[in-house]
């Protein structure tokens, strides 16, 4: 009885708060009590239209969520659907302004309020808002209706132009309203919303300048665009108050009073120095709340709370600084949909934190959202978890002209305005392919107009020779620079199903086996008789490939010379319902599966990425498991940042591993014996610095259930979810790594099973019969709008069953409105601590600069081989006697390493002789690469080095399974698409060359 009384009081209080708008400005959750109909009914815009038989939904909710991961991306349903909502405004709202904010709809949408047409939104990517004030009925029911068409080929009505980013390869088409909706009620003198396309307003802008990291000081600025919709002048005072993460006020300041005329829009500003600041950083999501308020005659009439953070950035010398510390980018290029099976992209805010937080746990510091502006929920999530973002606007694989380019600039403008207060965004990306210099200048001007003080670099993919770009980087290849930083926009496209450990484990999948065809991302047609082994990995080979590919960037890190790589992002973090090349109908390049269960490469990256540049915390991981048949003899792979790794089996040493690619240790021909397999890492002094182990599990005996949920509990709002984890364990509680049992689930209570994913018919989407894979799986369960206890049972043949109960808490909704704002209650994570004040790297190499060069041919182009421009080259005239070039160095030096990028790097091996003066210091054939090669040469004191071709080069693609989505141009220096690009005819072609001295530590 006592609990019932308490619940009644809480409900009454919540309803009372909604019933009477008492603050100067109210933001309501507008997600509840929508109605959905799939099909086109023009009369649905009318107020009196009968919608009682429509499906009741809580937003965010795409109409085709059931298809997520069941169908391949190009098969996702596109059609017309309607959403309707009945609502009333609280008492006290009369004579106020009312705005609606949709965080995004897909694709083209017509909006109606009380039967009146209020506008169109078509880009399918960004937020949109409308002023509802002229149409609202105060004290009466209002009806909002939205007609949405998510046609893959949707075209802008005014021009007939298709949006470039509405693409069947990368932009999963979860149609309808897959993002949140908010209702804002303000005074007639108010701070505008950052929604430009429809409202033509820019909102609040918070930024910091004169940042002094060591002394914890900065000058914090606040700017608010305000509008006066009274019919008389208003003398406005602008006040700012800054609160720390605990809600404590740390600074108040104000600007000068301003008279704003009727109908006028003005920008008010204020600034003050604040000390004792905590600066936002990687893995340190320290956020402040900045409240900006408008006062008239001593009375507060409007207030906006902006959650933001402060950090210092710098971009130059090929490097990136965050809070005065150099950081090499390491992370993931993630699909903007960031989707899950059975629900698509529409998950609660805490689950976004869980997913994005896993990237930080994996020691990633950057997520590059691909092709489309990320959802605001993901952007705010990255603020909280401390994950740097590269924010796209919208594009596909090529630069564009005309209306399609204008669409891109408009979307970039809107995205910058909407997201410029989010500290985790450090990069604005203008294209997934190189754009022209003129277009780069145009995009830069947009940034300078709307975010001149945000400390963000703007660039595009590639941009190797366009100095107006503030960053760049290719896809798949390795770039270096001593000007604007270069980081790889995508690398390592290989795929691997989590289910496949190795060839020695059930289900004994032969590595690479699966298909000899895949659907082209360029034509959407199936290409047959292709080598698809790289897209059907087992987890051991998938892990090795990930190690090899990261090594290419780590080797060129800051501290290795004047020209460096600023890192790169591996393509996708979690398996995705987008373009794929493997045998499954979704992409499995993720280091986790679609339910965010880690694969082995997750732990490999955790090892390789634990540091800002250099490794700061030694780690170790044994690849795979230790449950095999008694006669198995196999290699054991260990990923570690230690200087030496020793393997022990049941306490007996098996010796030290063979080290390759710096991080990979191989122990060949290890005979399986049940028990404990341990790997111990040692530092350069022989001291143990890290340890990992695998334990043989017994036979499967029991099912274990556990729940991952919001730290604030499960909400009965019809949209919140819990993540149910199921494991098969032995009698001692150890997970059985080879278990693939089919589990049957039953759910009792007010909740909806949305399920998980596994290999099989329809990928088991929505099925309550779901197998574990490698002993584990997960499923999503969504709340109803009725609170209560939910009981879940799991059964399987031959296993002890399991049961778990959990309760959902009420969320108060009155007349379609709620004060509960998902995400507001989630706190920033401070797991990695504040930015260290120590250097992030030690110099390991120094360059010996080139003064000049003399070449056997094309002398005037010799400088192009050392001009820090990877789109230029020197080459001879194709004759062997002219295939040489001699470099004069700035000083006499004992060069012991030569780093080169040779034209056709993935196709050609050049037979070279290298001389220091007249002395031969290296002879051999260069290896094929994805960019740079390193030759360890005999150190001889000299100020002159000659590179000479000694015969025709060997030809053939060394990376035949690595392909782009878009076709490279024939003029590109990898020669991949050039006619006869693998034919050399005594050519010597050098893109860049560097001479180095190693600083032996």
What are these regions (language model features)?
Residues 22-103, 158-170, 174-177, 185-189, ...:
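Extended carbohydrate-recognition surfaces in non-catalytic/accessory domains of CAZymes
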Residues 23, 51-60, 113, 825-895, ...:
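Disordered, acidic Ser/Thr/Pro-rich linker "stalks" and the adjacent N-terminal cap
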Residues 28, 40, 78-200, 388-390, ...:
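Accessory beta-strand-rich segments of carbohydrate-active enzymes
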Residues 61-89, 93-101, 106-114, 119-122, ...:
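Active-site-adjacent substrate/metal-binding segments within catalytic domains
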Residues 118, 138, 143-185, 279-291, ...:
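Glycine/proline-rich low-complexity spacer/linker segments in large multi-domain proteins
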Residues 215-258, 634-653, 676-681, 740-743, ...:
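Beta-strand-rich binding/interaction modules
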Residues 222-226, 293, 636-639, 680, ...:
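Beta-strand-rich structural segments
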Residues 298, 353-601, 605, 614-626, ...:
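Substrate-binding/catalytic cleft of secreted carbohydrate-active enzymes
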């Amino acid at each position: 009885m006592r609990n019932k009384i308490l619940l009644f009081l809480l409900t009454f209080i919540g309803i009372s708060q909604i019933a009477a708008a008492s603050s100067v400005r109210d933001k309501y959750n507008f997600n509840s009590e929508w109605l959905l109909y799939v099909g086109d009914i023009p009369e649905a815009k009318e107020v009196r239209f009968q919608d009682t038989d429509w499906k009741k939904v809580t937003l965010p909710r795409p109409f085709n969520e059931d298809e997520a991961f069941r169908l391949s991306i190009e098969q996702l349903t596109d059609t017309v659907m309607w959403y309707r909502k009945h609502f009333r405004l609280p008492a006290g709202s009369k004579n106020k302004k009312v705005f609606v904010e949709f965080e995004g709809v897909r694709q083209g949408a017509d909006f109606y309020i009380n039967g009146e047409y209020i506008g169109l939104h078509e880009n399918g990517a960004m937020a949109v808002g409308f002023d509802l004030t002229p149409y609202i009925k105060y004290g009466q029911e209002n009806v909002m209706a939205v007609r949405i068409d998510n046609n893959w080929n949707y075209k802008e009505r005014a021009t007939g132009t298709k949006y470039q980013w509405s693409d069947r390869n990368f932009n999963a088409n979860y149609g309808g309203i897959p993002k949140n909706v908010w209702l804002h009620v303000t005074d007639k003198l108010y701070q505008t919303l950052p929604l430009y396309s429809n409202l033509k307003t820019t909102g609040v802008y918070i930024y910091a300048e004169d940042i002094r990291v060591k002394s914890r000081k900065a000058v914090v600025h606040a700017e608010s665009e305000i509008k006066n919709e009274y019919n008389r002048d208003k003398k406005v005072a602008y006040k700012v108050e800054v609160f720390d993460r605990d809600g404590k006020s740390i600074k108040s300041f104000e600007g000068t009073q301003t008279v704003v005329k009727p109908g006028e829009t003005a920008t008010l500003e204020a600034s003050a120095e604040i000390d004792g600041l905590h600066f936002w950083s990687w893995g340190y999501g320290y956020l402040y709340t900045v409240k900006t308020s408008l006062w008239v005659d001593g009375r507060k009439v409007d207030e906006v709370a902006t959650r933001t953070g402060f950090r210092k950035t710098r971009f130059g010398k090929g490097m990136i600084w965050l809070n005065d510390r150099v950081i090499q980018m390491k992370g993931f290029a993630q699909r903007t949909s960031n989707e899950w099976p059975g629900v698509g992209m529409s998950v609660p805010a805490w689950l976004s934190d869980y997913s994005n937080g896993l990237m930080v746990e994996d020691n990633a510091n950057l997520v590059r959202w691909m092709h489309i502006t990320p959802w605001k929920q993901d952007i705010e999530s990255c603020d909280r978890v401390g994950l740097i973002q590269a924010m796209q606007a919208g594009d596909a694989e090529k630069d564009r002209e005309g209306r399609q380019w204008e669409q891109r600039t408009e979307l970039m403008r809107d995205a910058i305005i909407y997201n410029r207060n989010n500290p985790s965004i450090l990069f604005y990306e203008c294209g997934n392919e190189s754009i022209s210099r003129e277009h780069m200048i145009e995009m830069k001007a947009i940034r300078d107009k709307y975010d001149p003080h945000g400390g963000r670099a703007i660039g595009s993919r590639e941009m190797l020779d366009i100095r107006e770009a503030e960053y760049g980087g290719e896809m798949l290849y390795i770039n270096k620079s001593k000007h604007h930083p270069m980081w790889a926009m995508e690398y390592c496209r290989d795929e691997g199903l989590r289910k496949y450990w190795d060839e020695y484990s059930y289900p004994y999948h032969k590595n690479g086996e699966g298909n000899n065809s895949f659907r082209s991302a360029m034509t959407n047609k199936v290409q047959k008789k292709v080598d698809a082994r790289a897209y059907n990995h087992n987890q051991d080979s998938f892990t090795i490939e990930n190690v090899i590919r990261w090594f290419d960037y780590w080797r060129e890190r800051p501290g290795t010379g004047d020209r460096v790589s600023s890192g790169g992002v591996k393509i996708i973090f979690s398996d995705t319902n987008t373009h794929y090349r493997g045998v499954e109908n979704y992409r499995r390049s993720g280091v986790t599966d679609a339910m965010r269960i880690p694969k082995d490469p997750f732990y490999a990256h955790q090892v390789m990425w634990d540091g800002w540049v250099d490794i700061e915390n030694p780690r170790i991981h044994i690849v795979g498991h230790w449950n095999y048949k008694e006669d198995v003899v196999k290699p054991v792979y260990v990923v570690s940042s230690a200087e030496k790794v020793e393997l022990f089996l049941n306490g007996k040493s098996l010796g030290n591993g063979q080290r390759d690619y710096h991080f990979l240790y191989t122990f060949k021909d290890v005979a399986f014996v049940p028990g404990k397999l341990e790997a111990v890492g040692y530092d350069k002094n022989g001291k143990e610095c890290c340890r990992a182990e695998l334990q043989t599990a017994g036979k499967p005996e029991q099912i274990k259930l556990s729940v991952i949920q919001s730290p604030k509990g499960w909400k009965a709002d019809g949209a919140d979810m819990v993540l149910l984890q199921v494991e098969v364990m032995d009698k001692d509680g150890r997970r059985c790594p080879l278990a693939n049992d089919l589990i049957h689930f039953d759910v009792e209570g007010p909740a909806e099973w949305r399920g998980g994913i596994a290999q099989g018919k329809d990928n088991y989407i929505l099925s309550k019969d779901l197998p574990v894979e490698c002993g584990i799986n997960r499923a999503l369960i969504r709340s109803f709008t009725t609170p209560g206890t939910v009981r879940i049972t799991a059964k399987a043949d031959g296993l002890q069953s399991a049961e778990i109960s959990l309760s959902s808490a009420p969320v108060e909704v009155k007349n379609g409105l709620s004060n509960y704002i998902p995400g507001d209650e989630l706190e920033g994570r401070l797991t990695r601590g504040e930015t260290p004040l120590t250097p992030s790297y030690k110099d390991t190499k120094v360059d010996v600069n080139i003064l000049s060069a003399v070449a056997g041919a094309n002398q005037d182009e010799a400088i192009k081989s050392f001009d820090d421009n990877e789109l230029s080259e020197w080459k001879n005239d194709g004759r062997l006697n002219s295939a040489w070039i001699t470099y004069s160095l700035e000083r006499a030096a004992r060069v012991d390493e030569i780093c080169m990028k040779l034209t056709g790097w993935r196709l050609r091996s050049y037979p070279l002789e290298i001389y220091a003066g007249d002395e031969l210091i290296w002879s051999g054939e260069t290896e094929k690469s994805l960019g740079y090669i390193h030759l360890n040469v005999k150190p001889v004191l000299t100020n002159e080095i000659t590179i000479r071709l000694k015969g025709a080069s060997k030809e053939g693609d060394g990376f035949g399974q690595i392909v782009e989505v878009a076709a490279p141009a024939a003029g590109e220096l990898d020669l991949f698409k050039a006619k006869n690009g693998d034919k050399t005819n005594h050519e010597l072609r050098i893109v860049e060359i560097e001479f180095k001295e190693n600083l032996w530590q």
